[in-house]
Amino acid sequence: MEEQCMLPYYTAQSSPAMGMFNTSMGKLQRQLYKGEYTIFRYAPMFESDFIQISKRGEVMDVHNRARMVTVGIVRTSPCLTLPDVMLLARPAAVCDNARCGPATQKTDSPPAEILELTRLLPLMFVKITIHNSIKKQLHLKLATGRSFYLQLCPPSDASEDLFVHWENLVYILRPPVEAYSGTKAILAGSTSDSSVFEEVQRSPVGYAMKFCEEKEQFRISRLHMNAEMFGSTYYDYTIEI
């Protein structure tokens, strides 16, 4: 309870995304709050669990188990009125030699689920659409043309329809996407307007975005904030592609 109270609420009162960021804290946000990735520790986040499906809505399974994905939508800077980053995470191995000793492995209590943060996607390079509103399915299309289909898996104790927030997100992110302090959305490979890129690089994901011309997603090795050098809205990224 104390952790949730210490997290900031979404403060951009004029933003249409304010409601979704004032929802309860999810497991990915709780994990990031512990400080592994400093840039995301206090960032407002909206997240949901999904299963990956095919275009026809069939569940894509691995070893007879549904492929679970946690999708987090993040606003990384207070100067932005709209979210700018999508995070993807998956369940990690709960116990291994590096994390758990023999004493831990012998306990009968169920271990807490650990998420592995696997991808950082600037939202200006992701097109999110509703694939099937009745079945609560999303279609994610990356700048390279690669597509993914996801079906919402709301918690059993959910007190509201979480898919409404995703529908709202789709609406507010429709082009032109003004997620970077008034700059317009640009597609990967469109590098003719250097002034636009200069403005975009002022956002926390500016360094990461330069890789989007050739890569549609990033594997995060390490993220840390260098506040003394760049100030409160500039971040130093180390990203493994």
UniProtKB/Swiss-Prot annotation:
The record's InterPro entries line, in alphabetical order, gives: GARIL-like_Rab2B-bd
Question: Which Pfam families did the record assign?
Answer: GARIL_Rab2_bd
Q: What GO cellular component term, any one, is given?
A: nucleus
Q: Which PANTHER family match?
A: GOLGI-ASSOCIATED RAB2 INTERACTOR PROTEIN 6, PTHR22574
UniProt record similarity statement: Belongs to the GARIN family.
This chain belongs to which protein, by name?
A: Golgi-associated RAB2 interactor protein 6
Write the lineage as a comma-separated list: Eukaryota, Metazoa, Chordata, Craniata, Vertebrata
Q: What is the primary gene name for this protein?
A: GARIN6
